[in-house]
Amino acid sequence: TLTADENIVLPLSLTRRTANEAWRRTVVEAVGLQDRLTHRPAELSGGQQQRVAVARALITRPAVLFADEPTGNLDSHTGGEVLDLLRRSVDEFGQTVIMVTHDANAASIADRVVFLKDGRIELDEDRMTRDAIYDTIKGLEVPR
């Protein structure tokens, strides 16, 4: 079983690339794992395991990053750090992030918010506040 650090750099190892140490530190610090890098999965909480997965996805600096509920099992502080890192990935590194979330706070950092209902696009808006997202969700709910 791999350590958290080995797991994070696995995509680089598979392609015989080495990690840029400054970027690796940035990613590890952003997800708060600097003290857990030598731990194996059984020694990590569910949230810590999710943070390893987020770091592993970011380590290669892909042009497009798909994030499915990236803050789902994280506390609000760590979730905020992950969202900050995703935002920085867009603003500083020119990456595109496509995020699926039910969290209005997470959606509010996006440049574009698309609402789906019954498999169809109901609304496609540029930047929305958290409150506007909540109001939109309320308007899309199916009456019981």
Describe each PLM feature range.
Residues 65-68:
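Catalytic Walker B motif of ABC-type/P-loop ATPase nucleotide-binding domains
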Residues 120-144:
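Conserved beta-strand-loop-alpha-helix hinge in the C-terminal portion
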Residues 40-50:
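Conserved ABC ATPase signature
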Residues 54, 82:
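Hydrophobic anchor residue at the start of the ABC signature
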Residues 2-9:
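Short coil-to-helix segment of the ABC ATPase nucleotide-binding domain corresponding to the Q-loop/switch region
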Residues 9-21:
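ABC-type ATPase nucleotide-binding domains, specifically the catalytic core motifs of the NBD
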Residues 61:
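Conserved catalytic motifs of ABC-family nucleotide-binding domains
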